From Swiss-Prot:
Belongs to the bacterial ribosomal protein bL35 family. HAMAP family: Ribosomal_bL35. GO terms for biological process: translation. The keyword tRNA processing does not apply. One of its GO terms (cellular component) is cytosolic large ribosomal subunit. It comes from Prochlorococcus marinus (strain NATL2A). This is Large ribosomal subunit protein bL35. It comes from the Bacteria. GO terms for molecular function: structural constituent of ribosome. The lineage of its organism: Bacteria, Bacillati, Cyanobacteriota, Cyanophyceae, Synechococcales. The keyword Ribonucleoprotein applies. NCBIfam families: rpmI_bact (TIGR00001). The gene is rpmI. InterPro entries: Ribosomal_bL35, Ribosomal_bL35-like, Ribosomal_bL35_CS, Ribosomal_bL35_sf. Keywords: Ribonucleoprotein, Ribosomal protein.
Length: 65
């Protein structure tokens, strides 16, 4: 059986944790930040866990994660 290919776009966006969950960046922290509060920007810097309903699709894109 040939090796499975990793989706490179997904590999750049998601990171697997030790427990098998996936971490992702939060949206809305790229540009247009002037009107956003420091508290919100600080919160948007943190990583979020991918929802369990989306994790299966991420797992298929990252077979070796």
């Amino acid at each position: 059986m040939p090796k499975l290919k990793t989706r490179k776009a997904a590999a750049k966006r998601f990171k697997a944790t030790g427990t098998g969950k996936f971490m992702r960046r939060r949206a809305f922290h790229n540009h247009l930040l002037d009107h956003k509060s420091p508290k919100l920007k600080r919160h948007l810097k943190t990583k979020a866990v991918v929802d369990e309903r989306d994790a299966e699709n991420v797992r298929l894109m990252l077979p070796y994660a």
